[in-house]
Swiss-Prot record:
Protein name (database record): Polymerase basic protein 2
Renumbered ranges of motif Nuclear localization signal: 753-756
Keywords attached to this entry: Cap snatching, Host nucleus, mRNA capping, mRNA processing, Virion
Function according to Swiss-Prot or TrEMBL: subunit of the RNA-dependent RNA polymerase which is responsible for replication and transcription of virus RNA segments. The transcription of viral mRNAs occurs by a unique mechanism called cap-snatching. 5' methylated caps of cellular mRNAs are cleaved after 10-13 nucleotides by PA. In turn, these short capped RNAs are used as primers by PB1 for transcription of viral mRNAs. During virus replication, PB1 initiates RNA synthesis and copy vRNA into complementary RNA (cRNA) which in turn serves as a template for the production of more vRNAs.
Organism the protein comes from: Thogoto virus (isolate SiAr 126)
Example of a GO biological process term: 7-methylguanosine mRNA capping
Cellular compartment(s): Virion; Host nucleus
Domain of life (superkingdom): Viruses
Any one Gene Ontology cellular component term annotated for this protein: host cell nucleus
A Pfam family hit: PB2_627-dom
Oligomeric form and interacting partners: RNA polymerase is composed of three subunits: PA, PB1 and PB2.
Family: Belongs to the influenza viruses PB2 family.
C-alpha cells in the first residue's frame, strides 16, 4: 500500500491539473480577472463584524444577566422559581437594570400589547429594506464560488445620508433642540431633522433616550460592511458551485467608498474654481488633470473609477473624455429629462433701478413640450409641461408626506410660477444667488402661486390637498396632480454625448441643440478634505493644500524662473484680471492700503524698461509689487506707500522687496527662495578656473566684479567679493600632457591592484604556516 499511495496521489494531482487547464481554456477572461474587479457579494450573516458572530452570541447568553432593560413593575423578580431580573437599578449613568435571557419570552406571553403606531415606527427601517428587496428586478441565475477575501461595501442609510460632521448636530436638533446653539443649528441637516422627528416620535415613548438616539443615528449614518466577494465560474464547476452557494441573493452594492468619492469631488472643485480664473479654463483644467496623481495613480485613472452625481466630479470626467450622470440637482431633488422638443433655453431678464443701475438675472425654461423625471428621497414621479405651463404631475409618495419642497423645486426647474423670474419680490435684486434664495423663502411661506397655477377641484379622489400633503383629507384637492401607478425609470431612449464648454459648462447633445446639465458657477459647495496621497507638484495649482510659506515659495519660483509667466502674472494683477494665483495672493498678504502705490511703481518700471521680464532680479522685484497690487485693500483708510517688507499672513516669515533677507534673498550670483537656490549665475566658476579658498579679508590677488570679468582679463589668480567674503579663483595648470595624465592614472591603478594581490597571497601563506 505504501508503494501505491504515491501513484494515486500523482493521478489525483494530474486530474486536478487537467481540470484547472480545462477551466482556463473555457474562460480565459474570467481567469485573468483580479478579485478586486468584482462588485457582487454574498451576504451570509447579519452581523456587522467579520469574525465569529455565533461565538459572540454564545458568550453573551452565558452571562447571568445578558439583557439590560428599563425598570418595569409588569415583570416580577421571580417567576416559577426562575429569577427574571436583578435588584440593582443604576447601571452607570442610566437608570436601567439587568435581566435574564428568558425575559423576552415572558413579555411576549404576559406583557402588555403596544400600539400599531409604535410597532410601525420601530419596524420602519426594516420595512423599507423589505420593500426595496421585493421591488428589485433579479437577473438571470449565475453560479459562483467564494474567495477568502472581503471588500468594504458602503451601506446607504435608510432616511437620508448626512455628513458625519453634521450627525451630532442633527441628533441634537431632533432630541433636545432647546439646548442647541445657533452654530449647531446651522450645521444640522434640517431635511433629516424633519424626517427623523416624524419617525422617532412614537419610538421615544417606549424606548430609552440612549436607544432612541442609537436608532436615529443608524437611520442617517452610512456604515461600512466587509462582505466576501463572489467570483464568476465556468459550466465545468457549476455543479459544485451550485451546491456551495445555492442559498444566496445578490444585493446592490457600492464598491467605492463614498467619502473617498466626495474627497475627489472636493479636489475637482478646487481645480475647476481655479481654472475658471484663467483665460482658457478648459485647456487649463485638462492640462492640470494630466499632471496630478493620487497615491501614485494618474488622475485620469482615478476619475474613471469614480462615478456619481457629484457636480465637480462630473465636470472633470467629461474633461477627460468620460461619461457622467444625466441628472440635474436642485436642493434635494434630482431631475432627468425623459424627452423634450427642444433643449431648455436661457432667458436674460434685466431689472432696472435707473438708466445707469441695472442687473441681469438669467433663468432657463422649456420651449415646447417636455417630460421630466424627478426624485426626492421616497418621493418620485414625472411631470409634463408645455413652455412654462405644467400639464400634469404624476407622483408616488408615502401617505401624508409633505410635498411642498419637491414641488417648489419643480417650479424653479421649469420657471413655472411667479414671482422669481420675470417679477421681483418687491425689492431690487442684488444678484442671482440672492434672487434664488428669495424664491424658495417667499413661496415656502405662501404657496398660493402654485395653487393658482395648478387650480383646485372638489373631486375628493385626487390625492394632493391644498396644504400640499399627499392623500390628506381635505374639502378640495389640487388639479392635474395624480398618483403614479407604474414604475418610471430616469432613462432616455437614446444615448447622448456630453460636451464640455469653454467656461466648463457640461452639456448633453440634443437633436435641436445643447442641453445644459452642470453649470460650475451655480454649484454651492463647501471646502472639504482632499483625497489622501494627492500630489499636485506637477500642476500650477500647487497652492491648494499647502501652508502660507509653501504657497509663497511655489508662486515666487514660478514667476522668477519663467519670464512669460511673470509677465502674465504682473499684467493680471495690474489690470485686475483673473489669475490662477489670485486666491494665493489674497491669502498671503494682510489687508493693506498699499495697492495704488504698488500699481504706480509697476507702471513706471514697465514704461522705463519694456524688456524687464528678461532679467530675473527685476522679475523678483516686480513679483513683490504685483503680489501687493493683487491683495485685498482696505477701502476705508487712506492709501499709503509700499513698505520695504511685510510679514506673510499667518506666519512669521518676512518678505523683503530688496531681497536682502527673509523669503527671497538675492546674492550677486544666486537667487534664493525659501532657503532653496532657484537661480545661480556662473555655476562652478568660470571655465578653466577652480575655486581655491574663501577669506574674510582680501587675499593678495586682483579684485574683480565677477568671475567672467577675471576670465576676460586673462588673470592666473583673482578674487570676487560676495556676502562679506572673498572667493579666490586660480587658473587650472597641468604640467603633463593630457595623454600622459591618462596613462599615468591607468598605470597607478594597475600597480595598486598588483600590490593588493601580493599582500593577500602573503597573508594566506602566513595563515597556513
Amino acid at each position: 500500500m505504501d508503494r501505491e499511495e504515491p501513484a494515486e496521489s500523482e493521478c489525483t494531482l494530474r486530474a486536478l491539473v487537467e481540470e484547472y487547464n480545462g477551466a482556463c481554456k473555457e474562460a480565459p477572461k474570467e481567469m485573468s480577472k483580479q478579485f478586486t474587479d468584482y462588485n457582487t457579494f454574498k451576504r451570509y450573516t447579519t452581523s456587522k463584524k467579520d469574525h465569529a458572530p455565533q461565538m459572540r452570541l454564545v458568550y453573551s447568553v452565558r452571562k447571568p444577566w445578558p439583557i439590560s432593560m428599563t425598570p418595569s413593575k409588569e415583570i416580577p423578580l421571580v417567576f416559577n422559581g426562575t429569577k427574571l431580573k436583578d435588584t440593582i437599578l443604576d447601571l452607570g449613568e442610566s437608570k436601567r437594570t439587568r435581566a435574564n435571557i428568558v425575559v423576552p419570552d415572558y413579555w411576549s406571553k404576559y406583557g402588555s400589547q403596544t400600539s400599531l403606531e409604535v410597532v410601525n415606527a420601530i419596524l420602519y427601517a426594516e420595512d423599507l429594506k423589505v420593500q426595496r428587496f421585493f421591488s428589485t428586478e433579479w437577473g438571470e441565475i449565475r453560479y459562483g464560488r467564494m474567495l477568502p477575501f472581503r471588500k468594504p461595501v458602503q451601506a446607504c442609510p435608510t432616511i437620508e445620508e448626512v455628513n458625519p460632521a453634521s450627525i451630532p448636530h442633527t441628533l441634537l436638533q431632533v432630541f433636545c433642540p432647546q439646548y442647541t446653539t445657533l452654530d449647531s443649528k446651522r450645521k444640522a441637516h434640517m431635511g433629516a431633522v424633519e424626517k427623523l422627528k416624524r419617525v422617532m416620535e412614537p419610538i421615544c415613548k417606549v424606548q430609552t433616550q440612549e436607544s432612541a438616539v442609537h436608532i436615529a443615528r443608524s437611520l442617517i449614518d452610512s456604515n461600512k460592511k466587509w462582505l466576501p466577494t463572489v467570483v464568476d465560474h465556468t459550466p465545468r464547476t457549476a455543479e459544485m458551485a451550485h451546491f456551495l452557494c445555492s442559498k444566496y441573493h445578490y444585493v446592490h452594492t457600492n464598491t467605492q467608498d463614498l467619502s473617498d468619492t466626495r474627497s475627489i469631488d472636493n479636489l475637482c472643485g478646487e481645480l475647476v474654481k481655479r481654472s475658471l480664473k484663467c483665460r482658457c479654463p478648459k485647456e487649463t483644467l485638462v492640462a492640470n488633470l494630466d499632471k496630478i496623481t493620487i497615491q501614485g495613480r494618474p488622475m485620469r485613472e482615478v476619475l474613471a473609477d469614480h462615478d456619481g452625481e457629484l457636480p465637480y466630479l462630473g465636470i472633470c470626467r467629461v474633461a477627460m473624455g468620460l461619461s457622467t450622470h444625466h441628472t440635474m440637482k436642485i436642493r434635494s431633488t434630482k431631475f432627468s429629462i425623459l424627452n423634450s422638443d427642444h433643449p431648455r433655453i436661457e432667458v436674460k431678464k434685466v431689472f432696472s433701478l435707473s438708466p445707469d443701475v441695472q442687473v441681469t438675472i438669467p433663468y432657463r425654461r422649456f420651449k415646447g413640450k417636455a417630460k421630466v423625471y424627478f426624485q426626492n428621497d421616497q418621493i418620485q414621479g414625472y411631470f409634463s409641461c408645455t413652455d412654462r405651463q405644467i400639464d400634469e404631475i404624476k407622483i408616488s409618495a408615502p401617505k401624508n408626506a409633505p410635498l411642498l419642497e419637491p414641488l417648489l423645486d419643480i417650479c424653479y426647474y421649469g420657471s413655472f410660477i411667479e414671482p422669481g423670474f420675470e417679477q421681483t419680490f418687491g425689492f431690487y435684486p442684488a444678484g442671482k444667488r440672492e434672487f434664488v434664495d428669495s424664491f424658495f423663502m417667499h413661496h415656502s411661506k405662501d404657496h398660493k402661486a402654485f395653487l393658482i397655477h395648478m387650480g383646485l377641484d372638489k373631486d375628493l379622489s385626487l390625492p394632493l390637498s391644498p396644504e400640499l400633503n399627499w392623500k390628506e383629507p381635505a374639502l378640495s384637492k389640487v388639479c392635474r396632480v395624480t398618483e403614479l401607478d407604474s414604475t418610471v425609470q430616469p432613462y432616455t431612449s437614446a444615448t447622448r454625448e456630453f460636451v464640455l464648454g469653454e467656461t466648463l459648462n457640461v452639456y448633453t447633445q440634443h437633436e435641436n441643440g445643447l442641453e445644459l446639465l452642470i453649470c460650475p458657477t451655480e454649484i454651492r459647495s463647501t471646502r472639504g478634505p482632499l483625497p489622501p496621497g494627492t500630489n499636485l507638484s506637477g500642476s500650477e495649482f500647487i497652492d491648494i493644500y499647502q501652508d502660507p510659506f509653501s504657497r509663497a515659495k511655489s508662486l515666487l519660483k514660478s514667476t522668477i524662473l519663467h519670464a512669460e509667466r511673470c509677465k502674465e502674472f504682473v499684467g493680471n494683477m495690474l489690470e485686475e484680471y483673473q489669475d490662477p494665483a489670485e486666491t494665493t495672493v489674497q491669502s498671503l498678504v494682510p489687508i493693506n492700503t498699499w495697492g495704488k502705490s504698488a500699481k504706480r511703481k509697476l507702471q513706471e518700471e514697465i514704461t522705463s524698461d519694456p524688456d524687464w521680464h528678461q532679467c530675473p532680479r527685476k522679475r523678483a522685484k516686480m513679483s513683490y509689487l504685483a503680489i501687493i497690487a493683487g491683495s485685498i485693500q482696505d477701502r476705508d483708510k487712506k492709501q499709503t506707500n509700499v513698505p520695504r517688507a511685510f510679514m506673510l499672513r499667518g506666519s512669521q516669515i518676512e518678505y523683503d522687496m530688496k531681497a536682502t533677507r527673509g523669503l527671497v534673498v538675492d546674492t550677486t550670483n544666486r537667487i534664493i527662495v525659501g532657503g532653496e537656490t532657484v537661480l545661480r549665475e556662473g555655476k562652478g566658476g568660470p571655465e578653466g578656473y577652480v575655486q581655491t579658498g574663501v577669506f574674510e579679508e582680501q587675499p593678495r590677488c586682483y579684485l574683480v566684479d565677477t568671475p567672467d570679468h577675471g576670465l576676460s582679463m586673462g588673470l592666473s589668480r583673482f578674487c570676487v567679493h560676495s556676502q562679506g567674503r572673498y572667493f579666490q579663483y586660480e587658473k587650472k595648470i597641468s604640467i603633463w600632457e593630457e595623454t600622459d595624465n591618462i596613462k599615468a592614472t591607468i598605470d597607478s591603478q594597475r600597480d595598486l591592484k598588483r600590490r593588493r594581490d601580493i599582500e593577500e597571497m602573503v597573508s594566506k601563506r602566513a595563515r597556513i604556516v
